[in-house]
Structures are given as structure tokens and as C-alpha cells.
């Protein structure tokens, strides 16, 4: 090139000198272009003419590495080589040969284009792939290269607060970080909205925002994307991370307001020119309640979604105070009010602390007896209120000198002597909004002098009533007996065939008062062979007895005797006539009616009501019925073994 230029300068220009020169340049350019074309064709034929084709796949999905081979091309064979070694070998009209077992069932080659298809992608499948294509009647092997990237399907990005810094002008510098779980590479991050007060760093995954309480609380959204997917995060309000800039730099605690659970409360701001104020913002935890001039109070959308009660919190249009209805326990805490100017700067700040208490129920007192000895009663009392919490104060009245109070004054140990009056203790539970008390009666635990006196009086009255009852019963029974006459049977009527009684057969009768008689007729004497001189007289001797007195029949010594025995009450009777025998009692509390047919003698035996003691039996050989009268006398108690009939009884004949 240099020689022609120098040579051209020495020649003088002529009329046709320029044409030969142009034709030489054209010829040279044509030769150069032809050479470059063959060079490019050779490079393309060897497969080194272009960069690898980039292909992206999703983890667990499928991908195809395409080959642009026309249908008319005669292919001898195609070999696919993976990141480490040969993968597959394919020939026309033959089955594909898989050379790596880890790809069995996941790898395939299309029939006409010989493209490579991989399914169920894994992270190990990423890398470089090469296809060697051999054509018939063509000596050069054509190569195609691919680069495979395998990406995960992105999950929803998560935004976290990394740091908060508070400046002196009530502003906060909040740093947010966006991340996607399981995706650390090839992920691009972006934030919306883009504001002049916000800046991004670290590939867009970190956002730093500077704001004041008076600035609008805009929602920030993080978007993450990779070649196969794109996801966005939930809106994040940075105002929730900077709700107390004044207190963070040492502001005052302000006023304390006490509220009652379930009732309304007002947090005062005392701002007379509330209507002329540009904006008032109340902050509480993650809640923001703001009111702009000539507008109703608005709450953060995040607050409304969490609050089941609509319009439960609002800012008063009169003095910009914060009003809360139906207080909940979670409403307690610090509140901060900021008054803003037109330039969104803070002009004043107020702190209010809200405390919430329950109205107390009636206290419950439980007690346990420690021990009671030496006349001293010692007990432990515990006072508690259901759902009272840790803010309940307990007091005991009256409080003795020896009493011991513990566990926040809810536990009391007290003692007293049995000779002392029992103290009635009162537990009072109180909190800042309510007060309730309950009295404990200690007389129900240990017996004292008053209780002993009452016990003895009660026992005495019971004994008196019992005695009066017994005495009344005895009087009633006595009157009942005296009203019924007692008598002995008169002479029985003899049957027609029985002769009249003779002098040797006399019937005696005795009239007695106040004695019990057997109400069961005597059993007749059994018929036995007797002499003709004996008269059989049915005396029909009948005595009356209480219905509940059983009747007993008992044989004695082979004879049957019927006793009509009556004992007369009173001590003012004349002594018994001569021959009258005093008989000792026989077998008390048993009524016996005996009939004996032996020597024509019949006796009847009756018990009195007082002692239930029978009179001894007597024996006689005559056919006579006797009544015996016994005078009251003091007789020693009978012995069990002394139930014998006197050997020589004497009777008096009243005939």
C-alpha cells in the first residue's frame, strides 16, 4: 500500500490515468473478499465460527438444545457431548444410544432435527454442551455449542428491616433488605416507588429511606427476577419502623392516662388551633393515625385490616385528641402526637402513656389450717381476684400485730387463742380503676368460747326437750291404762250338763284398777278323765293387754295353770289379810298364759304396766279359780336363777 501511494505521487496526472488505477483497486478488493469468504466458510464448517448458544431452564423442568438441520440433509451420525463426557450417539433409522446412566429416562434426541431434550432438570445439568454432526459425502464434521443455565422458580421476596437511625430533626433513616429464599445468584432486585429520599445498593437488594413522621407513609415494594421468573413482595410501610423518634433521642415520657377495659378513653393533645394545623399524626407501635387540615382523620390501611372494629380509633376535629372506643389490652402503651407544618416538618411533639385495667370482681379467700395446739389456732389465708393481673393491691383489715403478710400482701398468716374472740378478717383488692372486698368469718375454723357456749346451750335444750317428751309419754300412757277397768273373771257359766258348783268348788273374783289385762282369751283346760265329783266350769276368764304384747303359752310340770294376777298400785292400802302371801316377781317382761288340767285347778297370770312383773304361782288341789292381790312393797330385784314358786303359798278365799 505504501509503494503505490509513493508511486502515485511521482506520476503526473493525465487524462486516462485515473481509470487503470480504479480497476486495480476493485480487483484487489474482490480477491480480498473472496479470501475472507472462504475463510469464514471454513471456520463455520469446523464449528468455531460463533459463540455458544445460551439456553435457560427451570429447575425440575425440561429444556431443548436445538440443531438447525434441514430435512433434506443426509446425516451419517450425531454425537452429543455433555459438560464432562459424551452423552448420546444417534444414527438415522436406529435407536439412540445413551452413554451416561444418570441421563437414562431424562434424555432424548428428536428424530429429524437431532436436537437434545433433557427433562427433570437438576442443578448439575448446567454447563456446556456440544453436538458433532457428520454428514454423508462430507469430510468436515460440523459442531454446535450450547451453554445451559438452570434456575430455580423464584419465591416471594421477603423484606426485612436491617437498621434504623434517628436524627435530631425527628427524622429516621431506615434500611430495608430484600431477599429470595433459595436464589442467591442471577437475581435482579428493584424497588418501587423511586423517591429522591430513597437510595438503592448491593445490586438493588438494599434500600435506604429517610423520612419524618410528617412525611406520607408510602408503601415500598421489592421486585426480584431471574431469566425464568419474576416475583414481587408485599407492600412495606417504613413508618412502622420509626414510630418514636422523639423518645429514641431522649424525649420526655409525657402524660399518663388510665383506661378501663372495654370502655372508651381520650388521649389529650390540648391543641386549641387544631383546625388551623396542617397535619397531626398519632403514632402507636406500628399504627399511624393522621389528620390533615379540613379532612377527616384517616388510619393506615394496615391498621384497618388488623382491626375488627371499624372507626374504633380516630382524631378529634376539636382539639386533635386521640379517641379510642372499646379498649383492649393490646391498646396499652406509649402514644406520640406530632404537629406538622406545610413543609412536612415537625413543629411540636407530645407523648402520652395509656394504661388499661380491668374492673375487679369480688375477691376469693382460701384458707388452710397450719396447726391448732395449746389453745392457739394458726391459719393461712390467701386472697385472689380472677383475671386481676399483676397490678392488683391487697390489704387486710383488721391487721393484728402478730400477723405476717407476704406475696404482695395477698397472703396472710394469723393466729389467736381459743379464749379470745375470733377475728373477722376483710380482704380488699384494688387497682387504679376499681375496688372490691370480701369478709372472712374465722369462727367457722377453730372453736372459740362463744361457739362452746352455744354448743352447751344447744345440748342442754336437747336434753330438756327429750326429758319433757319422755315425761309426757309416760303421763299419756298412765292415763290410758287407768281408763280401762281391770277385773278378774266371775264365776263361769257351767254348761247344762255340768252340776252347780259345790262348796268345794268356789269361784272368786277380784276388782283391780290401773292394770293391764290380757286381751286374748284363756285356753280352755284340756279334757282329761276326772272324777264325777269334779265340776268342769268354763270360767271364760278374759283379761285385756296392749295390742303389741305377745302371747306365750308354756307348759309347766305336766300341769296347766291359769293365773289371773293383778297388782294394785299405791302405797296407802291396808295390809293383806291373814293368810295372804306376798309373792316375788317371776320372769319380767314376758307374758305367760298357762292352762293346767291337774287336780281341777286353773290360774290366770297378768302383768302390770309399770314393772311388767308377774306374781308367783300358787298351787291348789281344789277346783277353785283364785285372784291374787299384791300390795305395793319394796322387793329386791329378782335374780335370773330365783324364778321358783314359793313352796307354801297361802291364799285368802273371798267367797
From Swiss-Prot:
<feature type="glycosylation site" description="N-linked (GlcNAc...) asparagine">
    <location>
        <position position="424"/>
    </location>
</feature>
<dbReference type="GO" id="GO:0007155">
    <property type="term" value="P:cell adhesion"/>
</dbReference>
<keyword id="KW-0472">Membrane</keyword>
<feature type="disulfide bond">
    <location>
        <begin position="172"/>
        <end position="242"/>
    </location>
</feature>
<dbReference type="GO" id="GO:0072540">
    <property type="term" value="P:T-helper 17 cell lineage commitment"/>
</dbReference>
<keyword id="KW-0732">Signal</keyword>
<feature type="disulfide bond">
    <location>
        <begin position="383"/>
        <end position="427"/>
    </location>
</feature>
<dbReference type="GO" id="GO:0042110">
    <property type="term" value="P:T cell activation"/>
</dbReference>
<feature type="transmembrane region" description="Helical">
    <location>
        <begin position="455"/>
        <end position="476"/>
    </location>
</feature>
<feature type="short sequence motif" description="ITSM 1">
    <location>
        <begin position="601"/>
        <end position="606"/>
    </location>
</feature>
<protein>
    <recommendedName>
        <fullName>T-lymphocyte surface antigen Ly-9</fullName>
    </recommendedName>
</protein>
<dbReference type="InterPro" id="IPR015631">
    <property type="entry name" value="CD2/SLAM_rcpt"/>
</dbReference>
<dbReference type="InterPro" id="IPR007110">
    <property type="entry name" value="Ig-like_dom"/>
</dbReference>
<keyword id="KW-0399">Innate immunity</keyword>
<keyword id="KW-0325">Glycoprotein</keyword>
<feature type="signal peptide">
    <location>
        <begin position="1"/>
        <end position="47"/>
    </location>
</feature>
<feature type="topological domain" description="Extracellular">
    <location>
        <begin position="48"/>
        <end position="454"/>
    </location>
</feature>
<keyword id="KW-0391">Immunity</keyword>
<keyword id="KW-0812">Transmembrane</keyword>
<feature type="domain" description="Ig-like V-type 2">
    <location>
        <begin position="251"/>
        <end position="363"/>
    </location>
</feature>
<dbReference type="InterPro" id="IPR013783">
    <property type="entry name" value="Ig-like_fold"/>
</dbReference>
<feature type="glycosylation site" description="N-linked (GlcNAc...) asparagine">
    <location>
        <position position="95"/>
    </location>
</feature>
<feature type="domain" description="Ig-like V-type 1">
    <location>
        <begin position="48"/>
        <end position="158"/>
    </location>
</feature>
<keyword id="KW-1133">Transmembrane helix</keyword>
<keyword id="KW-1064">Adaptive immunity</keyword>
<feature type="glycosylation site" description="N-linked (GlcNAc...) asparagine">
    <location>
        <position position="413"/>
    </location>
</feature>
<feature type="region of interest" description="Disordered">
    <location>
        <begin position="521"/>
        <end position="556"/>
    </location>
</feature>
<dbReference type="GO" id="GO:0005886">
    <property type="term" value="C:plasma membrane"/>
</dbReference>
<feature type="domain" description="Ig-like C2-type 1">
    <location>
        <begin position="159"/>
        <end position="235"/>
    </location>
</feature>
<dbReference type="InterPro" id="IPR036179">
    <property type="entry name" value="Ig-like_dom_sf"/>
</dbReference>
<feature type="glycosylation site" description="N-linked (GlcNAc...) asparagine">
    <location>
        <position position="120"/>
    </location>
</feature>
<keyword id="KW-1003">Cell membrane</keyword>
<feature type="modified residue" description="Phosphotyrosine">
    <location>
        <position position="603"/>
    </location>
</feature>
<keyword id="KW-0393">Immunoglobulin domain</keyword>
<feature type="short sequence motif" description="ITSM 2">
    <location>
        <begin position="624"/>
        <end position="629"/>
    </location>
</feature>
<dbReference type="InterPro" id="IPR003599">
    <property type="entry name" value="Ig_sub"/>
</dbReference>
<dbReference type="GO" id="GO:0006955">
    <property type="term" value="P:immune response"/>
</dbReference>
<feature type="domain" description="Ig-like C2-type 2">
    <location>
        <begin position="364"/>
        <end position="452"/>
    </location>
</feature>
<feature type="glycosylation site" description="N-linked (GlcNAc...) asparagine">
    <location>
        <position position="169"/>
    </location>
</feature>
<feature type="compositionally biased region" description="Low complexity">
    <location>
        <begin position="530"/>
        <end position="542"/>
    </location>
</feature>
<feature type="topological domain" description="Cytoplasmic">
    <location>
        <begin position="477"/>
        <end position="655"/>
    </location>
</feature>
<dbReference type="GO" id="GO:0045087">
    <property type="term" value="P:innate immune response"/>
</dbReference>
Amino acid at each position: 500500500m505504501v509503494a503505490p501511494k509513493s508511486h502515485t505521487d511521482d506520476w503526473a496526472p493525465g487524462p486516462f490515468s485515473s481509470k487503470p488505477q480504479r480497476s486495480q483497486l476493485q480487483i484487489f478488493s474482490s480477491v480480498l473478499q473472496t479470501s475472507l469468504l472462504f475463510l469464514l466458510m471454513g471456520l463455520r464448517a469446523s464449528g468455531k465460527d460463533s459463540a455458544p448458544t445460551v439456553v435457560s431452564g427451570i429447575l425440575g423442568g425440561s429444556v431443548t438444545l436445538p440443531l438447525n438441520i434441514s430435512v433434506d440433509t443426509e446425516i451419517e451420525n450425531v454425537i452429543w457431548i455433555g459438560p464432562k463426557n459424551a452423552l448420546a450417539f444417534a444414527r438415522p433409522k436406529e435407536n439412540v444410544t445413551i452413554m451416561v446412566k444418570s441421563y437414562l429416562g431424562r434424555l432424548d434426541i428428536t428424530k429429524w432435527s437431532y436436537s437434545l431434550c433433557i427433562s427433570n432438570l437438576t442443578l448439575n445439568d448446567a454447563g456446556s454442551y456440544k453436538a458433532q454432526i457428520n454428514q454423508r459425502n462430507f469430510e468436515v464434521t460440523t459442531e454446535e455449542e450450547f451453554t445451559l443455565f438452570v434456575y430455580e422458580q423464584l419465591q416471594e421476596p421477603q423484606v426485612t428491616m436491617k437498621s434504623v437511625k434517628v436524627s435530631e430533626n425527628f427524622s429516621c433513616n431506615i434500611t430495608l433488605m430484600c431477599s429470595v429464599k433459595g436464589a442467591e445468584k442471577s437475581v435482579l432486585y428493584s424497588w418501587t416507588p423511586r423517591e429522591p429520599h430513597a437510595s438503592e445498593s448491593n445490586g438493588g437488594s438494599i434500600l435506604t429511606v429517610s423520612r419524618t413522621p410528617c412525611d406520607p407513609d408510602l408503601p415500598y415494594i421489592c421486585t426480584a427476577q431471574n431469566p425464568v421468573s419474576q416475583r414481587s413482595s408485599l407492600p412495606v410501610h417504613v413508618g412502622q419502623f420509626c414510630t418514636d423518634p422523639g423518645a429514641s433521642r431522649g424525649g420526655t415520657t409525657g402524660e399518663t392516662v388510665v383506661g378501663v377495659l372495654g370502655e372508651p378513653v381520650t388521649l389529650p393533645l390540648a391543641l386549641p388551633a387544631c383546625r388551623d394545623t396542617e397535619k397531626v399524626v398519632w403514632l402507636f407501635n406500628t399504627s399511624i393515625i393522621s389528620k390533615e387540615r379540613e379532612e377527616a382523620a384517616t388510619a393506615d390501611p394496615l391498621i384497618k385490616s388488623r382491626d375488627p372494629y371499624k372507626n374504633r380509633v380516630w382524631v378529634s376535629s376539636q382539639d386533635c385528641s386521640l379517641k379510642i372506643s372499646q379498649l383492649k389490652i393490646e391498646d396499652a402503651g406509649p402514644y406520640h402526637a406530632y404537629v406538622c407544618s406545610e413543609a412536612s416538618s415537625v413543629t411540636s411533639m407530645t407523648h402520652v402513656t395509656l394504661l388499661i385495667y380491668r374492673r375487679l370482681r369480688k375477691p376469693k379467700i382460701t384458707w388452710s389450717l397450719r396447726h391448732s395446739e395449746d389453745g392457739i389456732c394458726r391459719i393461712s389465708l390467701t386472697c385472689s381476684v380472677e383475671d386481676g393481673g399483676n397490678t392488683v393491691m391487697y390489704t387486710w383489715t383488721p391487721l393484728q400485730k402478730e400477723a405476717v403478710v407476704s406475696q404482695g400482701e395477698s397472703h396472710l398468716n394469723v393466729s389467736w387463742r381459743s379464749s379470745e374472740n375470733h377475728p373477722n378478717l376483710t380482704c380488699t383488692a384494688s387497682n387504679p380503676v376499681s375496688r372490691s372486698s370480701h369478709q372472712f368469718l374465722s369462727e367457722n375454723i377453730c372453736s372459740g368460747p362463744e361457739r362452746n357456749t352455744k354448743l352447751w346451750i344447744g345440748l342442754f335444750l336437747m336434753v330438756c326437750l327429750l326429758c319433757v317428751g319422755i315425761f309426757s309419754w309416760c303421763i299419756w300412757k298412765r292415763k290410758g291404762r287407768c281408763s280401762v277397768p281391770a277385773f278378774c273373771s266371775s264365776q263361769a257359766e257351767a254348761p247344762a250338763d255340768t252340776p252347780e258348783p259345790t262348796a268345794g268348788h268356789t269361784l272368786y273374783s277380784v276388782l283391780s284398777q290401773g292394770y293391764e289385762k290380757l286381751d286374748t282369751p284363756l285356753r280352755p283346760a284340756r279334757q282329761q278323765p276326772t272324777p264325777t265329783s269334779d265340776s268342769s266350769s268354763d270360767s271364760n276368764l278374759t283379761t285385756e293387754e296392749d295390742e303389741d304384747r305377745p302371747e306365750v303359752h308354756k307348759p309347766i310340770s305336766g300341769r296347766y295353770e291359769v293365773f289371773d294376777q293383778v297388782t294394785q298400785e299405791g302405797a296407802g292400802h291396808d295390809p293383806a289379810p291373814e293368810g295372804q302371801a306376798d309373792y316375788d316377781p317371776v320372769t319380767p317382761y314376758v307374758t305367760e298364759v298357762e292352762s293346767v288340767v291337774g287336780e281341777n285347778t286353773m290360774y290366770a297370770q297378768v302383768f302390770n304396766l309399770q314393772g311388767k312383773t308377774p306374781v308367783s304361782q300358787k298351787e291348789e288341789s281344789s277346783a277353785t279359780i283364785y285372784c291374787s292381790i299384791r300390795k305395793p312393797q319394796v322387793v329386791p330385784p329378782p335374780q335370773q336363777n330365783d324364778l321358783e314358786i314359793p313352796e307354801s303359798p297361802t291364799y285368802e278365799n273371798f267367797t
